[in-house]
């Protein structure tokens, strides 16, 4: 069995947490030889971080790679100096390309090339979390060269999807602005009845009714507009959506909301009404920025962007080569180098497992990955190499709600994809082990029991997060499988 953890203090804690449990079980069953054997094997069990596993693999098989046998892990300080040096050389070479100059002019500010250099580093760092990242550059560039035009690139669908989400949220805000505050109108009508003369009372009541009728009509019109925006965005209708929004961009149509009349609302909930209307209007303004031009103009931009992107990707490749050479000259490897070189040992360029991979697999009855929500695509490829071809000996444990390492290129969507597609484990923990030679199936078992908190605490947490978390905010909906369940209610 191999257990892979994501950060350095975890392996020792995992080993220490298993030992007392095994001791307790073996004392309760003194005749159980299997438990005694597991206690002895625990001290030699390969529980480690993915970086430690890869480093050990490289030290044992360096001769199969183009790395020096006496390489050493690079410290952050020395690596940063090499990055700066490699980037400086890369920029000096890149500026000989007119297309890169055009890219730098587009992103740069003033006479500095800082933005261009930072973009090269951002793209490089992103790519290094992917397997076979050099091929990915060609894949990323291909849509910009596609004859199908603007609709072929990812931004077409992403912008429309974001416009649909914003329209849905804005529509809900406009609909709720007055709906949740029905008492305000009645209170103002009651105040109007306090006027001294019948004519004054009638005038005041008419003013109140006119004001709230006007507000409701504006909000209904805004909600209907946002509903149409959402409908077109979901359908992928860029041109009709742009045509619908253009009059608002040009000032030919009044922007949705309560502009000009918010000060006339004097009820108890006036701040709530104003806030919701303002937030809905702000979301509509964002939609105008998401769909800023016609499809023809966007296609012209795509054609202009393609040579600049090609020049940027060429600069990224050049930086990669220079940076790698500088590390190689000093016999240094970064943690990401460990993982990429380990993948070369375990998998051929076409994705076929190597002979060495088959040998290493034989050492493990199971591969268990903890903190899986903090995995990136490169690490996931390594786990797949270590597992059997059927993947029935690979166990992934994680919690999307605890994903906090995006800044280190962790990709929670890898875990979310499995949560969304894998069925629940039939029979739960009581499911019998499949017969030898029977192909396994991917399945998910929710470990949602909380043994640390009282029922009142669990209930309060669930109440908050059911309202706060969504796939867009928090990477997952707080529903079945994510909601906490009190594991020991009788102890409180």
Feature roles, as predicted:
Residues 4, 117-333, 348, 392, ...:
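Conserved ATP-driven helicase/translocase motor core recognized via long
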Residues 22-25, 61-64, 85-90, 418-422, ...:
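Conserved AAA+ ATPase "sensor/coupling" helix adjacent to the nucleotide-binding pocket
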Residues 100-101:
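C-terminal helical "lid" subdomain and adjoining coupling/linker elements of P-loop NTPases
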